[in-house]
């Protein structure tokens, strides 16, 4: 009776697992389209799963966890194996990179019926056997083991489990442990590489989905790119290896960069720097053009390697002399062009006559060809003066027609009202479209500030070019070259002295020489008649330059005569 109930319960679990698988695949496909975290590392991944009786009612959660995590490792160079343990260990799927076989292995894993004791060391033995045989075949691929259990191990079982885990590590494997619910964290920390390699799940099997991202991040060791990817043949260089998980090794000092040259020779180099996302490694010298080096990384001092699809190729490189010669020729051509442009400015001097200023065009001209002037209009202005001596009074009225240019020279009366002529401004009319609508202003573009600055720079360069081009002699101009000669002055400079006492020979002053006096004649006798007055000499002294001090200037006009 108990056997029949157990079979019925197993069939029910199978149907429930099948329905769950359909839902999981549908949901997983949608999540993969959205894009999520994935691992591109090329290594061997072993799942060691506890199928003892304590997980009988939680096997679906374990399967769901493994199925989701397996789909995160998408490298074509990654191989996977499924191992279960209870009283003994069983390999459900041997190591393979075939995705179809991995899908079939997941189906076999779903059909597992838990039961028995927790002999974890049996699962590690099955993994170590595969690692050993793979290494003997020469693959030497890095291995990652993820072991899951839910209970505490007995003292003797813990001893065997730790021993087998150390054996797997000696073969080059990295061991991670997942503990669910009633596990002993101290035991798992000794079985795994370190305490950081343990993922506790204290909230039960339902919380396994929450650690998938953490396991993927810590267990994934991948090589994504190499810089540079193309090198010069026969030259030494350094390569930067980009990737993830390079510090997940137990000992960072055991990390190596490996170069597999033409799939035949493997050369290992110690990196200069080891970070979680990159390695700085010296690369070997590849002497021939066309050689290829596949990039690998070892986390255990060359015991096993993490492969990748990153390849470094060699090419022929020149020594740079051709480029240097080309740059030198371009520089010489540029120097000759500048010399041809600026040599006339430095040597030839052209003197040109200044052109007369252009005559300003006036809108209105009078009869003489002179532009008419607008004079102010003045009312009630009286000015005196007409006729000889200004005797007759003259009345001048500036009316609406304005005055003449001569009238502007007269003095303005006190009661005059001046009206200045108004200046008329013509504003440009806005341009209208055919439908009598004004053209809308164009919207401001995002590149308008940049375009404005470039236009201003272009205007500045254009002005400088125009200034230089105007100074250059035109064809047909003649001139002469400037010769600069330094003349040495032997006489030292003297300070000018303005004091007359210090001058040795003052300039001669003009001396006025009066004319000779007239000859003295004796007085005539009293009875003699009076002789005529002699005429003045023909030569007279020059008149004085300034007028006499007591003489007043003549009036500007004669005073008015009184009316009779």
Swiss-Prot record:
Its main location: membrane. Keywords: Cell membrane, Cell projection, Disulfide bond, Glycoprotein, Hypotrichosis, Membrane, Metal-binding, Phosphoprotein, Receptor, Signal, Transmembrane, Transmembrane helix. Residues 44-215 form the VWFA domain. Residues 402-422 have a biased composition (Basic and acidic residues). Residues 33-321 are extracellular. The chain crosses the membrane at residues 322-342. Residues 505-564 have a biased composition (Pro residues). Disulfide bonds join 39-220. A divalent metal cation binds at residues 52, 54, 118. Residues 343-564 are cytoplasmic. Residues 1-32 form the signal peptide. It is found in: Cell membrane; Cell projection, Lamellipodium membrane; Cell projection, Filopodium membrane. It is a single-pass type I membrane protein. Interacts with gelatin and type 1 collagen. Interacts with the actin cytoskeleton. (Microbial infection) Interacts (via VWFA domain) with the protective antigen (PA) of B.anthracis. Binding does not occur in the presence of calcium. This is Anthrax toxin receptor 1. It comes from Homo sapiens. The gene is ANTXR1.
